[in-house]
Amino acid sequence: MNYQDMIVKNKEWIDGVWEKLDKKLSRTSVKSRDKIPYSTKNGVHDSCTEGVLITNWTNGFWGGLMWLMYAGTKKDCYKLTAERSEELMDTCFTDYVDELHHDVGFMWHILSGANYRLTGNKRARNRNLLAAMTLMSRYNVDGNFIRSWNVTWEKIDNAGWTIIDCMMNIPQLYWASRELGDDRFKKIAVRYADMAMRDHVREDGSVNHIVVHDTEKADTVIETLGGQGYGVGSSWSRGVSWALYGFVLSYLHTKEERYLTTSKKVAKHFIESVEKTGYLPLLDFKAPETPVLYDSTAGAIAACGLIEIAKAVGGEEGEYYLSAALNILKAMEENWCNWEENEDSILQMGSERYARGHHKPIIYGDYFFTEAILKLKGVDFLPW
């Protein structure tokens, strides 16, 4: 069965979920217009707008979610809330420049970048370009990598750290390269993707969350760290999903087959892992059997990547990836989605990391779940 036939077969379910998303989010978009939520407390969105919290890496997802809904509905309630979110984040550039980090792609590409591509807003374009320049400035020329976090409060020497998550930030560099006609941005993105392919992705398709590099000698790995997973050598499911989606995005931006091949390799590991648990992703695929910890956000991110792989490869091979995406989304919608109108979050059972923050609603879960449904609806808008 080809891609379009599978979409037609599942159209009733896809349309039904989209209607529920629109019904709930159209209300929440107004209720939380002056917030930038991360999670909820007693069903009500919290907000990361005060002080340095405005630089939280997740702050682009609320406005980005609004742009997804605007792309699919053209309703002003979504556009107004997305624009308000951008305005609130302007203090990052005026008051907290030293706090900006590698996740500026998450913060602005799906927010300001989406705004510019959907509406042509020049101010939004400038915001996204500023963020792209910030990301490019983190490139270590000697070590040949983009540095991840800033100096932490523990004062750990992390100058050589890279993380797999950053595969989702480099699409901002591909965009800036095209927008400015400056290939420096793309070259750095490609170098990062090639590094991640070599140093983060393992033979079995699982990934190293953190890789420690020599800061003065190019392409030299010192060690790997467990990061947000169970430990060194484990398989943190959200890290796997960042790689799965991130590499197919690099393929879409460059048409380099090696990135699609890598994405498919990672996808095989993800699919085989979730098949064992009814398509509900565990927090870490290689952790001990107990405690049983899940992470819905990994499933939502992976579904987005699987849909893009399916469209890229087509045919019977594409059916394998699209079927997996649908199975994951349907399992999560049935078991983990909250459609109560008096509660603000949708996708439950997100987990921050193995050590803490388990089984809670997290804004990027709602974002990627909605993005996946938008893709299935056939809306021609890639926010990355």
Pin down the residues of each PLM region.
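Glycan-recognition and catalytic cores of secretory/periplasmic carbohydrate-active enzymes
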Residues: 1-384
